[in-house]
């Protein structure tokens, strides 16, 4: 059998196993119901006889069961197979978001017509909600045609995209909170069902993930694991599944050949980065390398969703610099739009480049780099700003040997992110400000998102040291209810307040957050006086392993081809 035939066979096996597990879930629900009904009755596994029974079973793990059941039944399912019902749920959610976008446009456009700030929020919201549906469509497109021959990776991909959809929708709501408009509540109501449906979809997929662990599926289908290991082996050290174009790029010794060159002095094809980006082929599926020569490039750069597999290579993080000064407080720009550089196209890589926002602490929210792309890698980059410097908005991201500097919430967002061997630099804030390194934005307890600092160095710039006892610095604070941040193997200088973490507002999220420090060192790592919130965790070595790049990002599958230093686990 050829490779294509083998892959099809594997896919059929995987689909069959997932369906079988979901049927087991339905049976379990039926058994539980039977047990609760009568202890004297003989327990008999129930059959899926009606659409109602099947829908109720699939909706069992969700938080919004009534919304789940009503939406699926209204869609008149023609199948009682659990997998088909979950796919139907994705379609229903997409239609719900699209209908809500239209409703918001009809009902709120007139109300926002005389308010530039609110009108801008409404326009941005429409874009974000369309991005949310794109992630849901990714789930549908990959449901039958997934290519990674491991069930766990397939399920995790779905969780990543569902988490991304949730992040986009939450960002829409956050955008309205930045205005003084009363329309924020209207937006919450209009998109209430859509957001509940997305959460329900994540709950269903997460339940599959849990079942895989409980039933030890990788052990049952061990040939899949063996097949995956085969895919990752090759004599030249490059995974065998990497395509010929990428292989040639990776195998090149003495540097990478650029597709285009950007230079201020006219020695390249283009003088601006945005001009070079316009040369990226449509539906690009192979590395497109843009070499950006030494210089300061004052431009707002947007790598759009259509610009995939783009690589930026500079002459050094302090030699090639992209700069801007858009900000929320002085410039009246929405936080999401303040980014000097916005990365939206998947499979993006940046090496040896600096990104900065020069608005200063007076500008308040002023993003230097926003990353919404999936499978993004940054190596030897410098990201400088003050408040909200690095916006790790959504999806999988890996930073290695980078420097990030700032004051308030300067690494924030809801991506699945690992910063490895990075320097985290606290800067001097305004007189009345404290400094918080992280503000992770996980808003649903099942999201696969979180922020991990591994083998990093947390320090302060020289100007901060004299004011550290006045303008105290903290490891982070919970931006959203299920905020998750893990700091491990990191050297923490004497710049962090002994309490370690700071509340966001009163007791918000203190019970539901997930914060952990594991095997850190340095004078700021002493946990004796740390806050004692219920959400603070003490990790075992096994638990800590979950947050290494190999596990948390499934990084072994996609980071090594970028040829950057990479440590999958602890060594």
From Swiss-Prot:
Cell compartment(s), UniProt: Secreted, Cell wall
Quote the EC number: 3.1.1.11
* A biological process term (GO) from this entry: pectin catabolic process
Record GO terms (molecular function): enzyme inhibitor activity; pectinesterase activity
Where are the annotated segments for Pectinesterase 58?
259-556
Task: Name the PROSITE patterns on file.
Answer: PECTINESTERASE_1, PECTINESTERASE_2
Instruction: Name where it mostly resides.
Output: secreted
| Amino-acid positions noted as binding substrate in the UniProt annotation, renumbered to this chain | 335, 365, 477, 479
Catalytic residues in the record: 388, 409
Positions annotated with a glycan in the UniProt record: 36, 91, 207, 216, 347
Expression sites (tissue/organ) = Expressed in siliques, but not in flower buds.
Q: Name one GO cellular component term.
A: extracellular region
Q: Which reaction does it catalyse?
A: [(1->4)-alpha-D-galacturonosyl methyl ester](n) + n H2O = [(1->4)-alpha-D-galacturonosyl](n) + n methanol + n H(+)
Q: Kindly list the residues the record flags as site (Transition state stabilizer).
A: 387
Domain of life assignment: Eukaryota
What would be one Pfam family of this protein?
A: PMEI
Pathway(s) per entry: Glycan metabolism; pectin degradation; 2-dehydro-3-deoxy-D-gluconate from pectin: step 1/5
The family this protein is said to belong to: In the N-terminal section; belongs to the PMEI family. In the C-terminal section; belongs to the pectinesterase family.
Family matches, as NCBIfam families:
PME_inhib
Q: What is this protein called?
A: Probable pectinesterase/pectinesterase inhibitor 58
